[in-house]
């Protein structure tokens, strides 16, 4: 079924001008976020016009909307945070630290007998680095496949890592970390941070060590340090402390052999919040073909490197005077919302079948695709092409000789601008990206 569009009524008048200005502003903002090559100083989008040629639409299918269209937004007014199944926010680091401080305040006598100085509402000062280094012997080359003690990494400044890498042994084992366990909650902490202390210096603050958790000694021989089977690692001891005190599995070692305390938090991403499906939800798949005179005017500053680099910038005006388009549009109506996007050629062929089974020849000037022995080759070429075809560009700069611009970089600028226009279109309008309109 074909659809006739009153293109003039949709693109003219105050509403059409406002829509054209919004499109111009949108493309301009996207160009400001692009890293420009050395020979281009800036790109500005000056105007946008819909042209006079209307696109042609043919309805291909009516079906149920895609699952992604039912996903709730964070600020959706129709969604209630109190409903069952709503994901809970994990506790922050500040909350976890306050829990440890509360326990210390409730047991001052026990901690005062184990640790020097009063604790009150302040954190217990950590021992100096000189004392720690003096209590540890020189070690032989370590095995980086094992868990590493954090005190073997001094707080020397590491380029790009403020504060050094002294907390590497706590939560970032070099023996391979699972991609599903991200120690974000442990980033601000280290061996000298308040709230957590190394058990090899202080012991277990919350409870005396049980028989299942051997207490590490202060001094270790080279054999003990390099062998992962002769002593419990610091991460293992911290795992037992964290499981008893704050129940935070994000701080535990991913390869810990202690399995007596199961994780209380799921490492998988939170489930998506979805709209409820209704019988009146509808999705339309349309074949959209366009070969018109849509116009887009841009100005780029081209840098001249003679007699010195970036000597002067010349304005280069680029006018996109028309383009050809062939693609499948998706329009879905769900609960007073209209979702709109285009399908990539591969998705369109999967959903609607290959080009050989579709009718062709909608618009003069676009070669029909399919038919005969050349249909497969044409379909293969279509998969490699962009949805935007045959973008026609006119450039204006300085004096021309034999119909060609004098500057050598004009061709590079045109190619760069066209590539970015295609990239913006595909990233913003091709599924799984889509636009939602309230109706």
Curated annotation (Swiss-Prot):
One of its GO terms (molecular function) is lipid binding. GO terms for cellular component: endoplasmic reticulum membrane; ERMES complex. Keywords: Endoplasmic reticulum, Lipid transport, Lipid-binding, Membrane, Mitochondrion, Mitochondrion outer membrane, Transport. It is found in: Mitochondrion outer membrane; Endoplasmic reticulum membrane. Residues 71-84 have a biased composition (Acidic residues). Residues 212-229, 256-269 have a biased composition (Basic and acidic residues). Residues 230-255 have a biased composition (Polar residues). The keyword Endoplasmic reticulum applies. Residues 71-104, 182-278, 362-385 are annotated as: Disordered. It comes from the Eukaryota. PROSITE patterns: SMP. The SMP-LTD domain is a barrel-like domain that can bind various types of glycerophospholipids in its interior and mediate their transfer between two adjacent bilayers. Component of the ERMES/MDM complex, which serves as a molecular tether to connect the endoplasmic reticulum (ER) and mitochondria. Components of this complex are involved in the control of mitochondrial shape and protein biogenesis, and function in nonvesicular lipid trafficking between the ER and mitochondria. MDM12 is required for the interaction of the ER-resident membrane protein MMM1 and the outer mitochondrial membrane-resident beta-barrel protein MDM10. This is Mitochondrial distribution and morphology protein 12. It comes from Uncinocarpus reesii (strain UAMH 1704). The gene is MDM12.
């Amino acid at each position: 079924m074909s659809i006739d569009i009153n293109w003039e009524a949709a693109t003219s008048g105050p509403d059409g001008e406002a829509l054209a200005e919004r499109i111009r502003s949108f493309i301009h903002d996207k160009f400001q976020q692009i890293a420009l090559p050395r020979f281009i100083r800036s790109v500005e989008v000056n105007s946008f016009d819909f042209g006079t040629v209307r696109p042609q639409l043919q309805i291909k299918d009516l079906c149920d909307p895609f699952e992604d269209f039912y996903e709730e937004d964070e600020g959706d007014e129709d969604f209630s945070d109190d409903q069952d199944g709503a994901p809970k926010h994990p506790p922050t680091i500040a909350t976890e630290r306050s829990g440890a401080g509360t326990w210390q305040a409730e047991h001052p006598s026990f901690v005062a007998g184990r640790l020097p100085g009063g604790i009150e509402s302040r954190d217990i000062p950590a021992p100096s680095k000189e004392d720690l280094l003096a209590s540890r012997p020189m070690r032989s080359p370590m095995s980086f496949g094992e868990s590493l003690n954090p005190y073997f990494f001094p707080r020397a400044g590491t380029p790009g890592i403020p504060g050094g890498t002294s907390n590497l042994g706590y939560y970032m084992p070099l023996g391979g970390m699972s991609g599903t366990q991200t120690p974000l909650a442990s980033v601000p902490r280290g061996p000298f941070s308040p709230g957590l202390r190394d058990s090899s210096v202080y012991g277990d603050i919350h409870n005396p060590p049980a028989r299942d958790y051997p207490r590490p000694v202060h001094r270790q021989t080279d054999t003990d340090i390099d062998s992962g089977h002769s002593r419990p690692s610091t991460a293992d001891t911290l795992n037992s402390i964290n499981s008893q005190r704050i129940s935070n599995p994000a701080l535990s070692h991913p390869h810990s052999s202690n399995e007596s305390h199961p994780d209380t938090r799921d490492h998988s991403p939170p489930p998506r919040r979805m709209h409820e499906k209704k019988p009146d939800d509808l999705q339309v798949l349309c074949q959209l073909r366009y070969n018109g005179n849509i116009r887009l005017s841009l100005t780029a500053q081209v840098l001249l490197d003679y007699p010195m680099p970036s000597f002067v910038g010349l304005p280069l005006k680029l006018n996109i005077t028309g383009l050809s388009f062939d693609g499948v549009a998706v329009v879905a109506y769900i609960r007073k919302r209209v979702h709109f996007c285009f399908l990539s050629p591969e998705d369109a062929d999967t959903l609607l079948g290959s080009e050989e089974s579709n009718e062709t020849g909608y618009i003069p000037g676009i070669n029909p695709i399919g038919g005969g022995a050349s249909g497969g080759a044409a379909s293969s070429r279509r998969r490699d092409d962009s949805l935007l075809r045959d973008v026609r560009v006119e450039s204006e700069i300085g004096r021309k000789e034999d119909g060609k611009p004098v500057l050598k970089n004009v061709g590079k600028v045109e190619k760069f601008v066209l590539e970015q226009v295609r990239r913006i279109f595909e990233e913003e309008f091709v599924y799984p990206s889509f636009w939602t309109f309230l109706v």
